[in-house]
Amino acid sequence: MACAEQDKLGQAFEDAFEVLRQHSTGDFQYSSDYKNYLAFINHRSHIRGNSNSYGVQPAEEPIYNWRTVINSATDLYFEGNIHQSLQNIPENQLVQPALLQQKGGKGRKKLRLFEYLHESLCNPEMASCIQWIDQTKGIFQFVSKNKEKLAQLWGKRKGNRKTMTYQKMARALRNYGRTGEIIKIRRKLTYQFSEAILQRLSAPYFLEKEIFYSQYVQPDQGYLSLNNWNANYNYTYANYHELSHPDC
């Protein structure tokens, strides 16, 4: 990569974060990795600018892929805003959302039943086992003839050796009723997610991230188009605040 192109890349990287910072609702905190990256870009620009005076030929420049840079940047932006929106929820109602779980490794959190149920509700192939009654209110119902099948699939998903039954699963649902994540509705096999849980499970993180990313990076494009960024950023930012919870 030419020196001029590398300089433009470093400047564009800083500009991207400046835009995110200006449009965020609170202080936008850079991680140490991004601070180190900015320092690295600036340092290399300084060395290149003075290398000719020492008779040193600049080394071959590594190619930085904007997919990785922008993908990480939007992770920080959207996760930061979700974190801020959760600060107003009472502590006893907070449940770590699946979208913020660690991706693999020993620190990965186990999938919880209410997460699995919401996932199944969002899966058309599971409509014979569980269905929405009122999605906006988080009300759902188990299909009587296939409720055992859903329970068995849940047991397999957990890695249980013994077959999971609906009776055992219903016991866990009653425990949720005591803690407030899911409550029983006065209707057969019908339950309701709490508002706080429904908001976390329905958070439009991945949808918005895809919109944010696709506005200025084409499918086969590994670099950033600043013209596309300027033309589409305001549109994308407005969509983030206007879109309601997407349909599953």
From Swiss-Prot:
InterPro entries from the entry?
A: Ets_dom, ETS_fam, WH-like_DNA-bd_sf, WH_DNA-bd_sf
Q: Name one GO cellular component term.
A: nucleus
Cell compartment(s), UniProt: Nucleus
Alphabetized SMART domains for the sequence: ETS
Has UniProt tagged this entry with the keyword Hydrolase? Answer: no
Query: What are this entry's molecular-function GO terms?
Result: DNA-binding transcription factor activity, RNA polymerase II-specific; sequence-specific DNA binding
User: Where on the tree of life does the source sit, at the highest rank?
Assistant: Eukaryota
Going by the UniProt record, its keywords in alphabetical order are:
DNA-binding, Nucleus, Transcription, Transcription regulation
Question: Which SUPFAM superfamilies does this one have?
Answer: Winged helix' DNA-binding domain
Instruction: List the stretches of this chain annotated as a DNA-binding region.
Output: 111-194
Q: Which GO terms describe its biological process?
A: cell differentiation; regulation of transcription by RNA polymerase II
Keyword field contains DNA-binding: yes
The record's function comment reads: Controls the development of red pulp macrophages required for red blood cells recycling and iron homeostasis. Transcription factor that binds to the PU-box, a purine-rich DNA sequence (5'-GAGGA[AT]-3') that can act as a lymphoid-specific enhancer. Regulates VCAM1 gene expression.
Oligomeric form and interacting partners = Binds DNA as a monomer.
Sequence similarity: Belongs to the ETS family.
Q: Would you tell me the protein name for this molecule?
A: Transcription factor Spi-C
Source species: Bos taurus (Bovine)
Ranked from the top, the taxonomy reads:
Eukaryota, Metazoa, Chordata, Craniata, Vertebrata
